[in-house]
């Protein structure tokens, strides 16, 4: 990773949302480095119009403005591979923010090369995980990349000082109309929307119900359950209720339906990679449905030991993504194993959505390992000889019997 020399910085590619922080960063970079700023705005399904960012950038004299629809690439190449692993961090978090950063880092590096830029920049703070994710992703793809992280350099340490800077530099903040200003720091993409700050900084304070943007409260959800049939090919959803859909379309549809039924709300305290604990609230309707359904189809099609091995490796895989190592040898190795395991994960899962809960109520597959003739409680016509269990138990209990015969008390 190259060291920063301000005198050599002439062009900077900025990950730009058009919001307060990155608008101020754009101006700050222009003034501090006397450099040309090139903006990159990614549409990864945040649910807002990204085009207004163009007008905002133009108003600051920015000539090269990149606005790209990356929803399909994000869903297909990042979210879906992660869900083949059933990845969750610390038992609950579906990695919605973590998985979005590698793609943005990748495009930052690529655009920097296109423009022969000297540096890239982002709006992540010096306290969070995103700075790590952006910069590890960038250096993995371009070892000589120079990254400018203004939050680690400037003296604008509060929202008030940011607002003052914006006023002094004639930076218009609210380009989205008259929407009510949220007291929370929010980040959204196809997989989730996150909320931090405000009253959430007190881990005992319950989030206000009007905070949630994507879902109704389970209490207000419909009184009638909704059923969905999700069709899988090699571990990925390819159709919903018989309608073939692209990965990003799958997520849009499941977010809409799941949100209507109060699916996917989460309130957690997590351990950040940088060392502190952080309280966050998340809405992940599609991801919650996808995780439940994927485990449902795997239960039918995966060999027992393969399934158990996946479960053992999953926490390491999830931590790898959470900590920013998507572009790493270990993630690629784990992904190869995971993808191999999905070869026969084909079929249909039927799920029931009702007042915040997702239940698998049916599953079928031409690649099913479930053998009704063997598993039945009725007459199996000799398919399974129950006498075989006697020897199985005797051999598996042999070591325990030897322990007991030596007078060792295994009850304590």
From Swiss-Prot:
Alphabetical list of CDD domains matching this protein: ASS
Enzyme Commission designation: 6.3.4.5
GO BP annotation list: argininosuccinate metabolic process; L-arginine biosynthetic process; urea cycle
Major place of residence: cytoplasm
Reactions the enzyme catalyzes: L-citrulline + L-aspartate + ATP = 2-(N(omega)-L-arginino)succinate + AMP + diphosphate + H(+)
Locations listed in the record: Cytoplasm
Any Gene Ontology CC annotation: cytoplasm
Coiled coil: none
Binding site for L-citrulline: 93, 98, 129, 133, 185, 194, 270, 282
Positions of L-aspartate binding: 125, 129-130
Entry's Gene Ontology molecular function annotations: argininosuccinate synthase activity; ATP binding
UniProt pathway annotation: Amino-acid biosynthesis; L-arginine biosynthesis; L-arginine from L-ornithine and carbamoyl phosphate: step 2/3
Protein keywords: Amino-acid biosynthesis, Arginine biosynthesis, ATP-binding, Cytoplasm, Ligase, Nucleotide-binding
Protein family (similarity comment): Belongs to the argininosuccinate synthase family. Type 1 subfamily.
Descriptive protein name: Argininosuccinate synthase
Lineage: Bacteria, Pseudomonadati, Pseudomonadota, Gammaproteobacteria, Moraxellales
Gene designation: argG
